[in-house]
């Protein structure tokens, strides 16, 4: 119980705005000695389960708690007036379906000392997603429409480190085995590639989840200029192609007149203008904040995915309409054939009647009957003969039992 109270006092100290229930259950199980000895940054451990990656290694070094700074800016921030709203919260779904809250401000991170010379270092595990470390001042909002701007707030000594010299241009270089390559013309100012072990793959699944993954060997150095905007422009015939792994399905290309401006002024806004005709028309604005998952800093993004009606939807609708039309034609042909056959059968019934007797048949049958008194005989015109013998009247009753009379009448 005293251990929990001491941990609560440390977490609720000046400069930390962490919730009580966020740390009571998760931080109580951690050892307090190593945390105090290393002076680590205290952070809550929501179960931010990732869909594809489950870290199973030891947690890395945590960041430092500076309790003498304000939640908005660090002691070495270049310009504190360009900070976006500090309490901008974003909600996303974790693997268990629970709604997790990710803030880009230092509310759930603790106060971070962000001097331009000493920045915090975040290392990612081999299965962790791409760790984008954020300064308190800039925040990243990647908007992929043509007029949108991407505000990246990254720390400078992390796996994706931003250094801010005065006249440096942004140069991102890679060995030949890089999996992601942004190729521009010789007038392009930036070539983004990764190390041989780098796997920064922007993969867009049917659920439209974009996961940017980089192993620890991937070191992406972004050097920014504080007073000038760096514009990455491509010629009309040059397009920016991000070649991903075999599982990657999203290709980001720039249109003819589109220019990708990576501006990291003191406000650290990076404008990524990309072609709106990317695969499946994904317009994915996301804001990245640095959170920890079981002690591992990782990039968590709020993916607000808009699905415009693209070409595959039109194709599927057209195919469905074509199938319905074919079935309707088959049903119509069947109905017409049925009506025609019914009409023809009814006309044949009238042309060929079932029974058509003539009086000659009756005459021929009656001529075979004997003239004796075996019943009344029919004359030529169908009348009955009146010649009867009174003595033979009882015999026809005996002979008429069954069909004997008819058989004897036809025999010679």
UniProtKB/Swiss-Prot annotation:
Source species: Homo sapiens
- Annotated protein name in UniProt: P-selectin glycoprotein ligand 1
List residues, modification Sulfotyrosine.
Answer: 46, 48, 51
Known tissue expression: Expressed on neutrophils, monocytes and most lymphocytes.
| Signal peptide start-end | 1-17
Q: Which GO terms describe its biological process?
A: cell adhesion; cellular response to interleukin-6; leukocyte adhesive activation; leukocyte migration; leukocyte tethering or rolling
Name of the encoding gene:
SELPLG
Which residue ranges run through the membrane? Answer: 321-341
> Which residues lie in Low complexity bias regions?
66-82
Functional summary from the UniProt entry: A SLe(x)-type proteoglycan, which through high affinity, calcium-dependent interactions with E-, P- and L-selectins, mediates rapid rolling of leukocytes over vascular surfaces during the initial steps in inflammation. Critical for the initial leukocyte capture. (Microbial infection) Acts as a receptor for enterovirus 71.
- Positions of the propeptide removed during maturation: 18-41
Q: Where is this region: 12 X 10 AA tandem repeats?
A: 122-261
* One GO location term (cellular component): uropod
Positions of modified residues (Phosphoserine): 409
Keywords on record:
Cell adhesion, Cleavage on pair of basic residues, Disulfide bond, Glycoprotein, Host cell receptor for virus entry, Host-virus interaction, Membrane, Phosphoprotein, Pyrrolidone carboxylic acid, Receptor, Repeat, Sialic acid, Signal, Sulfation, Transmembrane, Transmembrane helix
């Amino acid at each position: 119980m005293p251990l929990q109270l001491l941990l609560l006092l440390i977490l609720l100290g000046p400069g930390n705005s962490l919730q009580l229930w966020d740390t009571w259950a998760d931080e109580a199980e951690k050892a307090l000695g190593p945390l105090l000895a290393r002076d680590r940054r205290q952070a809550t451990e929501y179960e931010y389960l990732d869909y594809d990656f489950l870290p199973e290694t030891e947690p890395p070094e945590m960041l430092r708690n500076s309790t003498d700074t304000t939640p908005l800016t660090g002691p070495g921030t270049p310009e504190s007036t360009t900070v976006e709203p500090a309490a901008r919260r974003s909600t996303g779904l974790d693997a268990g379906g629970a709604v997790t809250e990710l803030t880009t401000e230092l509310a759930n991170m603790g106060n971070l000392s962000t001097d331009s010379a000493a920045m915090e270092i975040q290392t990612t595990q081999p299965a962790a997603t791409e760790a984008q470390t954020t300064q308190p001042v800039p925040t990243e909002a990647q908007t992929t429409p043509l007029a949108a701007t991407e505000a990246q707030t990254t720390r400078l000594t992390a796996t994706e480190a931003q250094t801010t010299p005065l006249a440096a241009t942004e140069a991102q270089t890679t060995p030949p085995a890089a999996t992601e390559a942004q190729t521009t013309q010789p007038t392009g100012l930036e070539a983004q590639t990764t190390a041989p072990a780098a796997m920064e793959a922007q993969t867009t699944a049917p659920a439209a989840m974009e996961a940017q993954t980089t192993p620890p060997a991937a070191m992406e150095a972004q050097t920014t200029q504080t007073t000038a905007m760096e514009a990455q422009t491509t010629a009309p015939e040059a397009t920016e192609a991000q070649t991903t792994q075999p599982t990657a399905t999203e290709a980001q290309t720039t249109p003819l007149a589109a220019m990708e401006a990576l501006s990291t002024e003191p406000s650290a806004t990076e404008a990524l203008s990309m072609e709106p005709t990317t695969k499946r028309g994904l317009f994915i604005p996301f804001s990245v904040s640095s959170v920890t998952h079981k002690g591992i800093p990782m990039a968590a993004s709020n993916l607000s995915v808009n699905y415009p009606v693209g070409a595959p939807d039109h194709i599927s609708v057209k195919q469905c309409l074509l199938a319905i039309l074919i079935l309707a034609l088959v049903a119509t042909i069947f109905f017409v054939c049925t009506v025609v056959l019914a009409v023809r059968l009814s006309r044949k019934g009238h042309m060929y009647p079932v029974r058509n007797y003539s009086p000659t048949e009756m005459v021929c049958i009656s001529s075979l009957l004997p003239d004796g008194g075996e019943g009344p005989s029919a004359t030529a015109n169908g009348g009955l003969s009146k010649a009867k013998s009174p003595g033979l009247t009882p015999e026809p009753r005996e002979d008429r039992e069954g069909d004997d009379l008819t058989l004897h009448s036809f025999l010679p």
